[in-house]
A protein has these predicted regions:
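Switch II of P-loop NTPase G domains
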Residues: 1-33, 37-60, 108-118
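ATP/adenylate-binding site constellation spanning eukaryotic-like Ser/Thr protein kinases
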Residues: 1-4, 68, 123
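Active-site-proximal flexible loops/turns
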Residues: 10, 43, 74, 138, ...
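Short, compositionally biased low-complexity segments
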Residues: 35-43, 65-73, 150-155, 170
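C-terminal-of-GTPase-core extension/linker across diverse P-loop GTPases
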Residues: 77-171
Length: 171
């Protein structure tokens, strides 16, 4: 596991950690999105309000924008015959989905190998981890409900990172 600082809106254009963040997640095999799903006046949120569904949407958008940039550059090279016709076709298919705001999906192992080799992020397996406070861990919150509603096909796990942190300190 590699802990990489969060992504902010505009990262695909270099804002926040921007391209540094995106280059870090290119190296991982899967992406675990840890989103805050609890209220606390002691911990401020980067956007001043807690909305994990919006936080996830920001990440998804930035990943899609990054993938669009990668594919567009590769297609320009493809026109110079640096890619096979099959590779160009695959990229053009993925471009259609990405332009609609839909993450790229792979159809087979060879396609996955090719798309991974060029650094597409949207094809990586993902898990959403909702970080809750201890009292809502078993029941969830309105925030977890929003995440489940907006991402019904994603793997979602509820945890209390505070409890995990306390347990890790025990000898």
């Amino acid at each position: 596991f590699v802990d990489i600082a969060g992504l902010v809106k505009g990262a695909s254009k270099g804002e926040g950690l921007g391209n540094k963040f995106l280059s870090h997640i290119r190296e991982v095999d899967a992406i675990i999105h840890l989103v805050r799903c609890f209220d606390s006046e002691k911990i401020t949120h980067v956007n001043s309000k807690i909305n994990p569904a919006d936080d996830l949407e920001t990440i998804k958008t930035e990943i899609i924008l990054s993938d669009l940039g990668i594919i567009q550059k590769k297609l320009e090279k493809g026109k110079k015959k640096l890619l096979s016709d099959k590779e160009i076709k695959i990229l053009e298919e993925k471009l259609v989905f990405l332009n609609k705001g839909v993450e790229a999906k792979v159809n087979n192992e060879k396609e996955e190998e090719f798309l991974s080799s060029i650094g597409l992020l949207s094809i990586k397996p993902k898990i959403i981890v909702c970080n809750l406070d201890e009292e809502n861990l078993s029941s969830g919150t309105n925030y977890t409900s929003q995440v489940e509603k907006k991402y019904p096909n994603e793997k979602i796990i509820n945890i209390c990172a505070d409890i995990e942190d306390q347990l890790s300190g025990l000898d």
